[in-house]
């Protein structure tokens, strides 16, 4: 089970580092919880990529990115997950 607390250990190191770079340089924009547990974001890379993430509490149920990467999880999804986790920390304070 992938969660907001453990997803970093479930992602290949190179993808994680690239996702962290995108997150750290504010490449994630338009982060929005469109309905409970349903998140969308735009991540600026070579182009702007649309990311969708479905969650149940802290559990990540599914994700989608319209980038051309054909691996299981891309750097854009990682960046969006970092943004969601950061957003949830700010809201819960």
What function would you assign to each model-found segment?
Residues 1-93:
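Long, low-complexity, compositionally biased intrinsically disordered regions
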